[in-house]
């Protein structure tokens, strides 16, 4: 497949998403085409990315204008301290609002860099070059930035749209399979909230996508971006329909926080568990029918993806999981807000449940 270009139109910003293979040598060309100019540029690069994969970007940018900050990307480093390190560099080097910050890394790097860009002098040009499957299909699009705290995930942040997103699928070949599965969690989520066609494509081709086979991986990325773009354009600040993008995430964020963001469960795996848990909760509350639940569960089983929360948690974790769900940013009453499924491709988001209902449900799931 050739170069794919999408245009995202939100109230605050219009920007392009460029998807292709081995396109980093054209970064400066893409910047010029999108009227992104600057005197200085700070690259925030995930230190875990092989250096040979970013050398084309460095060669492409104007000499003398670039500073580099290597960031040790992890959920534990997704915090205000890391944001402060970036903004301190910008201040020391006398950056101004006409300059640019470019993130090269996965979702964590993009979230931290984007938040730093949004707060520096109330807004610095921000270009996102996502390097993981998860960030290419989800977190790089839509303007959500932020950091974790001891009270929960992404509780401090901002909506700040990038000026440009450049997704080079060549990065994906360097990922361990577990990181590819991590991204597949968000692809699966998108397929369940927007019609049935994409889910059936995944159900048929999921193994090829996880194996990064062409053209299946490119199609999955393209379709995920189209779904995310459509939702973000309709509701930039998550006041309504954008909440459907949180399908599975209320459970997922609580699972991650309960494990203190340990390597036992990465974000995408938590999302897959959260999707399964939300689908089962939908079934048991007579919102989703059994046939469609079994289609979803069967798909997870066929791909050997995480399905059962009792393999990661025990009953002793129940109160902690509930406490993090209580702190979820989508809640605006004493009840817990959940995005559930009516059918594959048809989510419902204006649903609230008392803690007792969720407690009883999780208790049964944890003691199976």
Curated annotation (Swiss-Prot):
UniProt-annotated location(s): Cytoplasm
Residue numbers binding NAD(+): 131-132, 144, 153
One GO MF term attached to the UniProt entry: nucleotide binding
The protein's required cofactors: Co(2+); Zn(2+); NAD(+)
Entry keyword set: Amino-acid biosynthesis, Aromatic amino acid biosynthesis, Cobalt, Cytoplasm, Lyase, Metal-binding, NAD, Nucleotide-binding, Zinc
Catalytic activity reported: 7-phospho-2-dehydro-3-deoxy-D-arabino-heptonate = 3-dehydroquinate + phosphate
Broad class of the protein's primary localization: cytoplasm
Binding site for Zn(2+): 186, 249, 267
Superkingdom of the organism of origin: Bacteria
Record-level GO cellular component terms: cytoplasm
Stored Gene3D superfamilies: 3.40.50.1970, Dehydroquinate synthase-like - alpha domain (1.20.1090.10)
Enzyme Commission number(s) from the entry: 4.2.3.4
Function, in words: Catalyzes the conversion of 3-deoxy-D-arabino-heptulosonate 7-phosphate (DAHP) to dehydroquinate (DHQ).
The family this protein is said to belong to: Belongs to the sugar phosphate cyclases superfamily. Dehydroquinate synthase family.
Protein name per the record: 3-dehydroquinate synthase
Organism: Pelagibacter ubique (strain HTCC1062)
Gene encoding the protein: aroB
């Amino acid at each position: 497949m050739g170069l794919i270009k999408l245009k995202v139109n939100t109230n605050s910003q219009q920007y392009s998403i460029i998807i292709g293979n081995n396109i980093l040598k054209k970064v400066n060309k893409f910047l010029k085409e999108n009227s992104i100019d600057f005197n200085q540029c700070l690259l925030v690069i995930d230190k875990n990315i092989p250096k040979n994969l970013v050398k084309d970007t460095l060669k492409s940018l104007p000499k003398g204008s670039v500073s580099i900050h290597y960031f040790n990307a992890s959920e534990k480093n997704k915090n205000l301290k890391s944001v402060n390190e970036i903004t301190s560099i910008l201040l020391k080097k006398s950056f101004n609002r006409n300059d640019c910050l470019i993130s090269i890394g996965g979702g964590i790097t993009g979230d931290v860099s984007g938040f730093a860009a949004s707060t520096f002098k109330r807004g610095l040009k921000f270009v996102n070059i996502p390097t993981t499957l998860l960030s290419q299909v989800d977190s790089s699009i839509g303007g959500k930035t932020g950091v974790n705290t001891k009270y929960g995930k992404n509780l401090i942040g901002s909506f700040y749209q990038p000026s440009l997103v450049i997704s080079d699928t060549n990065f994906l070949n360097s990922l361990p399979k577990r990181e590819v599965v991590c991204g597949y969690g968000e692809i699966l989520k998108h397929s369940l909230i927007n019609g049935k066609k994409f889910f059936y494509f995944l159900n048929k081709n999921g193994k090829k996508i996880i194996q990064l086979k062409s053209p299946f991986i490119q199609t999955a990325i393209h379709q995920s971006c189209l779904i995310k773009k459509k939702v973000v354009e309709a509701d930039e600040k998550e006041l309504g329909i954008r909440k459907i993008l949180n399908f599975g995430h209320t459970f997922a964020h609580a699972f991650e926080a309960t494990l203190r963001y340990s390597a036992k469960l990465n974000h995408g795996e938590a999302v897959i568990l959260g999707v399964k848990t939300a689908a089962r909760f939908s079934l048991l509350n007579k919102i989703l029918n059994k046939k469609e639940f079994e289609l979803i569960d069967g798909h997870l089983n066929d791909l050997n993806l995480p399905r059962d929360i009792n393999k990661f948690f025990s009953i002793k974790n129940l109160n902690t999981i509930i406490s993090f769900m209580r702190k979820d940013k989508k809640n605006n009453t004493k009840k817990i807000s959940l995005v559930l499924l009516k059918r594959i491709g048809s989510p419902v988001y204006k649903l609230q449940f008392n803690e007792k209902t969720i407690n009883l449900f999780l208790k049964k799931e944890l003691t199976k």
